[in-house]
């Protein structure tokens, strides 16, 4: 909190910024996985580094503020500031705060690197990823041939989950088809394929229904518009902070056409985290 967005605060000391909303978004990414957390702080650091040279020339790009309107007239507003406000910016203080925030982020990025690189063979440094693999293994042992869905809101988390699960399958000579559904990124790999192939929504649904794939790695994009009731088991690597979003996920399998008597949903969260407090 001491360094959080102090650069923006230095640029607009008299303006009310939506820091609470931005902090909420950052906390949700941190609660998703180590990988999502690292990506967030790395992106923020790069954003500041790229902006610093402009600050030294008393310039600020329109893209610096996430809430700037691309349709604003640049003669009137620059990055949410009128020209008169831009003239009054204390650039020396902006540069000082930006450099302080970058130094703080360097520390956190280094710490994230240490944690992520502390893995031993076969064990992910993130307990959430390990728990996902354990639940996956348990499910396919007890329910062979029954498909499942693995959900995460964030691509960074889902990429690592997919890597870990596929690595587990390869290590244990488990051959099964799977699909990845992340918004515009849709890929499918059948058990006898060497490479992924591009897929449409209907291809993934059809492959799940006819048993050619047993697991789908889903981002929030799969929470809407997909009928995946051929699966009766779901793992939520992160739990949506908006209850209606969780209901949408569950609705992919708990819907008309579900043939099983019950659906099983496992939610994973870090102990003592915001997620654990929300859903206890």
Which residues make up each language-model segment?
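Conserved beta-strand -> loop -> alpha-helix junction used to position metal-binding or nucleic-acid-contacting
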Residues: 174-186, 239, 248, 262-272
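Conserved helicase ATPase core of P-loop NTP-dependent helicases/translocases
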Residues: 175-219
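Amphipathic, heptad-repeat alpha-helical coiled-coil/stalk segments that mediate oligomerization
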Residues: 197, 202-203, 236, 243-246, ...
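SF2 helicase motor core recognition
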Residues: 205, 216-231, 250-258
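A conserved SF2-helicase RecA2
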Residues: 212, 244-250, 254-280
């Amino acid at each position: 909190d001491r360094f959080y967005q102090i650069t923006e605060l230095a640029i607009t000391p008299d303006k009310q910024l939506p820091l609470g909303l931005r902090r909420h978004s950052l906390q949700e990414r941190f609660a998703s996985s180590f990988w999502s957390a690292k990506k967030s702080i790395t992106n923020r650091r790069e954003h500041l580094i790229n902006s610093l040279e402009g600050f030294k020339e008393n310039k600020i790009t329109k893209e610096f503020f996430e809430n700037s309107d691309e349709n604003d007239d640049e003669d009137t507003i620059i990055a949410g500031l009128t020209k008169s406000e831009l003239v009054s910016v204390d650039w020396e203080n902006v540069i000082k705060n930006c450099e302080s925030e970058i130094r703080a982020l360097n520390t956190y990025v280094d710490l994230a690197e240490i944690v992520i690189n502390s893995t031993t063979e076969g064990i992910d440094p993130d307990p959430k990823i390990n728990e996902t693999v354990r639940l996956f293994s348990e499910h396919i042992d007890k329910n062979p041939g029954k498909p499942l869905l693995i959900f995460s809101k964030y691509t960074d988390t889902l990429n690592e989950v997919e890597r870990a699960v596929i690595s587990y399958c390869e290590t244990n000579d488990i051959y099964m088809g799977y699909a990845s559904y992340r918004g515009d990124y849709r890929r499918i790999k059948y058990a006898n394929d060497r490479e992924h192939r591009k897929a449409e929504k209907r291809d993934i649904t059809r492959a799940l229904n006819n048993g050619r794939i047993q697991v789908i790695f889903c981002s929030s994009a799969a929470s809407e518009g997909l009928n995946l009731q051929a699966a009766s088991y779901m793992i939520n690597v992160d739990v949506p902070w908006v209850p209606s979003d969780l209901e949408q996920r569950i609705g992919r399998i708990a819907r008309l056409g579900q043939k099983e008597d019950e659906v099983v949903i496992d939610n994973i969260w870090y102990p003592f985290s915001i997620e654990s407090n929300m859903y206890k």
